Amino acid sequence: MSQLDSRSASARIRVFDQQRAEAAVRELLYAIGEDPDRDGLVATPSRVARSYREMFAGLYTDPDSVLNTMFDEDHDELVLVKEIPMYSTCEHHLVAFHGVAHVGYIPGDDGRVTGLSKIARLVDLYAKRPQVQERLTSQIADALMKKLDPRGVIVVIEAEHLCMAMRGVRKPGSVTTTSAVRGLFKTNAASRAEALDLILRK
């Protein structure tokens, strides 16, 4: 199955269960030895549940709806959006990883492009799910290939993982870089090198 995410089909029918989330947070507070009824924690289950609803909003949005606006610009060269701020949640520890995404594509033969803000929204949608960085990178690339039918797509994500910074090996400042290349960027070394040069150029 494509990395495009088998969960997409169910995104339209998922509903966040606020009550169940609050009960789970309350149980977690008991599990760590806290009293969820004390003043400082009495509203915490509700707050955490609402936060999770926002942090995982991408589970309840159909990716196709994000890329539903296209323009006939007859453009046949690279379109690159750099330094898109990105916040996601590691699915292994449910703590944040954050950084930037660089997303580029070469339009297909029809020259159609999508709005630049749509690319940022697509990054945000897939980031707002329990994730691993490798899959996140591929999902963004595959979604663009499916919807835009471009000649090529390149996605590079640079992120710091708090599961490495605040626990475990405790290496704050470590940056993980992942890439996904599709179409022309996979088969043509010159096109790939040009895109990477533009991405890495500060």
Swiss-Prot record:
User: Which keywords belong to this entry?
Assistant: GTP-binding, Hydrolase, Metal-binding, Nucleotide-binding, One-carbon metabolism, Zinc
GO BP, sorted A to Z: one-carbon metabolic process; tetrahydrobiopterin biosynthetic process; tetrahydrofolate biosynthetic process
**Protein's pathway:** Cofactor biosynthesis; 7,8-dihydroneopterin triphosphate biosynthesis; 7,8-dihydroneopterin triphosphate from GTP: step 1/1
Does this UniProt record's set of keywords contain Transport? no
Q: What class of enzyme is it?
A: hydrolase
Q: Any idea of its EC number?
A: 3.5.4.16
Question: Cellular component GO terms, alphabetically?
Answer: cytoplasm
A GO MF annotation of the entry reads: GTP cyclohydrolase I activity
Q: Which NCBIfam families match?
A: folE, PRK09347.1-2, PRK09347.1-3
Name the record gives this protein: GTP cyclohydrolase 1
